[in-house]
Curated annotation (Swiss-Prot):
This is Aspartate carbamoyltransferase catalytic subunit. Pfam families: OTCace, OTCace_N. Belongs to the aspartate/ornithine carbamoyltransferase superfamily. ATCase family. One of its GO terms (cellular component) is cytosol. Its EC number is 2.1.3.2. It comes from the Bacteria.
Length: 311
């Protein structure tokens, strides 16, 4: 099966078969990351620009490693070191970058929809590395890959997502992807951090009580409190938040015995989850980071026109 999209803007745009293709390719590419020499010539001669308007550690580093393991050339541009600080618009930045003939632009931007705007104005491929509160497709894919490795499937899983849903592009990508793959998503968080109508995105249940969301869950995914996006009225204190929506060993016992604990990072330890849980046997947080490289290799591979056998 060939991947038919020029860009990857969000999981909302992808079919179940396309998501499976990206996950299966990532699973195949993981083997490269275990070799002594972690490089294949698949994207030799391709140029990838990582254009980040927001701070990032895991995503930007992971995309750069993914590109280099496929032998692509990478250029990293951050807003703080670019002409953006001089007032250059996204449109002008895009046209100037495009004039240098890149093959793929990987972009993170604070404004939801920025990637749609960019993709309409450039001829090269665009991959969304996070746009506002809209989507973070690579995170959603790596989360699903991590779950599938543990349970062998996504269909029928109960996945609890707890935290700041309003500002979370990770939550939205997981909702789109997981519900398309047959999982049931349960959401919990403070009422001020739960957007109205979120349940209309798929097979989603909104719970007022965190306990209801995580009871008998296969996966408990905790989200970071995005302090940089909070208004004064959304979060009284971190202590109060942790009291009602923080995960500890006692609460984790409500989930299934073999439940996974996940977090997209960075973690606010002692707020959304305690260190005992973050570093415990049920934590798959570092496995998520590990899988991120393979997933982003898969995304780069497929928007470059790669095709794998269906079997």
């Amino acid at each position: 099966m060939a991947f038919k999209h020029k860009d990857i803007i969000g999981l909302q745009d992808l079919t179940r078969e396309e998501i499976e293709l990206l996950l299966n390719t990532a699973e195949n590419l993981k083997e490269i990351n275990e070799r002594d020499i972690k490089k294949v010539p698949t994207l030799r001669g391709k140029t990838i620009v990582n254009l980040f308007y927001e701070a990032s550690t895991r995503t930007r580093t992971s995309f750069e490693i993914a590109a280099k393991r496929l032998s692509a050339d990478t250029i990293n541009i951050t807003a703080s070191t670019s002409s953006v600080t001089k007032g250059e618009t996204l449109s002008d930045t895009a046209r100037n970058v495009l004039a240098m003939k890149p093959d793929i632009i990987v972009m993170r931007h604070a404004v939801s929809g920025a990637h749609h705007y960019l993709a309409q104005r450039v001829s090269c491929s665009v991959i969304n590395a996070g746009d506002g509160a809209h989507e973070h497709p690579s995170q959603g894919l790596l989360d699903m890959l991590t779950m599938r490795q543990k349970f062998g499937k996504l269909d029928g899983l109960k996945v609890a997502i707890v935290g700041d849903i309003t500002h979370s592009r990770v939550a939205r990508s997981n909702i789109y992807g997981l519900t398309r793959m047959g999982a049931h998503v349960f959401l919990a968080g403070p009422p001020t951090m739960m957007p109205p109508g979120i349940e209309r995105l798929g097979n989603v249940t909104v719970c007022r009580d965190m306990r209801a969301a995580i009871t008998d869950a296969d996966v408990v995914m905790m989200l970071r409190i995005q302090l940089e996006r909070q208004g004064k009225t959304l979060l009284p204190t971190l202590k109060e938040y942790s009291r009602y929506f923080g995960l500890n060993n006692h609460l984790l016992q409500l989930a299934k015995k073999d439940a996974m604990v996940m977090h997209p990072g960075p973690i606010n330890r002692g707020v959304e989850l305690c260190s005992h849980v973050a570093d415990g046997d049920q934590s798959h947080i570092l496995k998520q980071v590990e899988n991120g490289v393979a997933v982003r290799m898969s995304m780069l591979y497929h928007v470059s026109g790669g095709e794998l056998p269906t079997e």
